[in-house]
């Protein structure tokens, strides 16, 4: 699964150009999802030095991205809108459901891994 996440007021509690405190629950679940093999893309309007500062700050929090403001390489094409299964953004409709959705993805992946290769009798 590909998960796009915004930086300002999402990963960080501050708005551009500042970097505030980390959204610890969001970092924790994204780090777990990445460890399960999901792709995480930083999708932000930040550019240049502010973008690099955000990427470096996230790395210090333990989160490294598969791509920044572009598709993961295996998508095979470039588009202005990054292709993803889930978009996490402070301006998104239903933003209060982020953690529930991300935890559901994490638990579903754990379950699939647990039963991978197990044949079911019908």
Give the residues covered by each predicted segment.
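C-terminal cap/substrate-recognition subdomain and adjoining C-terminal extension
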Residues: 51-122
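Alpha-helical substrate-recognition element adjacent to the catalytic core
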Residues: 1-74
């Amino acid at each position: 699964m590909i998960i796009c996440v915004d930086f300002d007021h999402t990963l960080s509690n501050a708005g551009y150009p500042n970097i505030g405190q980390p959204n610890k629950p969001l970092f924790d679940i994204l780090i777990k999802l990445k460890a399960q093999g999901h792709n995480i893309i930083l999708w932000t309007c930040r550019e240049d030095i502010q973008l690099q500062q955000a990427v470096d700050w996230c790395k210090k929090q333990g989160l490294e991205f598969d791509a920044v403001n572009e598709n993961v390489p295996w998508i095979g094409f470039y588009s202005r809108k990054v292709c993803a299964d889930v978009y996490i953004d402070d301006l998104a409709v239903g933003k209060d459901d982020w953690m529930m959705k991300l935890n559901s993805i994490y638990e579903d992946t754990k379950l699939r891994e647990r039963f991978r290769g197990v044949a079911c009798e019908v």
